[in-house]
Amino acid sequence: MYFANANIHPQNEYEHRLETIQALASERAYPLIEGSYDTDAWEETAGRIGQELEELREGAGIANEVVDSPNPYPLPPKEDKGPHVAAAREKAAQLRRARCRACYRLRFEETAHYAAEHGFDAVGTTLSVSPFQYTDIIEEELLRACKKAGVNCAFTDYRPYFEDNERISKEMGIYRQNFCGCHFSDEEAQLERTIRKAARKAKKAALKAAKKEAAEKELLGSINENL
C-alpha cells in the first residue's frame, strides 16, 4: 500500500489518517509506504485552482451554495438568479472538477512513479469506493498516470461495496473522516451538511403545518355537522 495524501489538511488530520492505516497494515501484515507530504506542491496545483473557485463564488454571490457536488443524494434546487449567476455556477462546477482532477493527478503520478521505480507492475486506488468522489475523473487520471510511468492500470469501481466498507470499518472501530481531505473539501462538506440539515428541518416543519391544517379542517367540519 502506498499512502499519497499531500492534500490532507490540517497536519493533525493527516497524521490521524496515517496512523489509522498504519495500524491496519500492521495488523494485516501489509507493507505500507508513506508518500511525500508536500503540501506546497499541492497548493501550487490543486490549491491554486481551488482558490480561483473560491474567488469566483465570492464574486458571483454563490459562496453559500454547494457547487457540483458528486454526492449521489440530491440537494434542494437552487434559486434562479438570472443568466449571469447561471454562467458563474457552470464555471464554478468546471473549476471544482478541475481542482479535484489536479489533486488526483498529483497523487497518482507520485504513486505510479514509485511503483515503476520499485518493480510493481500495476497501480490501483481505493478512492473509487466513495460515491462522493468523481469516479470518472479518478479512472481517467489513474490511467493517465500509469501510462506515463509505464505500469498497468488496475482501476476497479468499488462503489458497490461502499456500504460494506462502512459497516466493516465501524465494526473494527476504524476512524472515518467526514470530508475528502483538503481544506476546500472540509468547508464544502460542512456547507453541504448545513444545507441538508436546513432542508430536513423545513420539510419537517411543512409536514407538521400540513397535519395541523388538516386536523383543524377536520375539527371545523365536525363542528359544522353538529350545528
List each language-model region with its residue ranges.
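Nucleotide-activated chemistry modules centered on ATP-dependent adenylation/adenylyltransferase
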Residues: 1-227
